[in-house]
Amino acid sequence: MIAYKFLRPDGSSVFASFRWPLPEAEPGDWVEAPVEPCRSGIHACRASHLPHWAGRALYETELGGRIVEDAGKVIAERARLARRVRAWDEQRDAYTRMCADRAHELVRGAPPELAHWDSVVEPSIPEGPALLGFVAARIAEEIEGRADAYHAERARQARWLVERLGLPAM
């Protein structure tokens, strides 16, 4: 199964700080761990969940062995980094800006009591794509008053990423 994983620029994972064997001309070495969601196993995501995990460096990841689907992620017994998605390096700032612009757009159409969200957007840009995607989705949820608006905004963001990064359709 092909999935995706965001890592720090040095190849270490954000939550566990595990340093991955990086791919060069060939995929990196296999890594193994028992599967236990949020505790152990190789955590990755499908393209539809990229906005939830946006980070500095994106890798296409080959999963193997036992694979468990969980909310917003997949957990595998084995994985290796197949390749770095270089298009993310080129599109990360554009994605952040798109999310900021979308947040502004949503606030412009929102009831006056949600106007305070607009002041959050620009100061959040240096924090990067994960925060801006979340802010836009939260504004959508506040406007509609229901969680499916949040998920619809996240799905819109995922479609943008799939298209711009040249990933297989979801």
Set out the residue ranges of the language-model regions.
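Short, glycine-biased loop/turn motifs at secondary-structure junctions and
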Residues: M1-M170
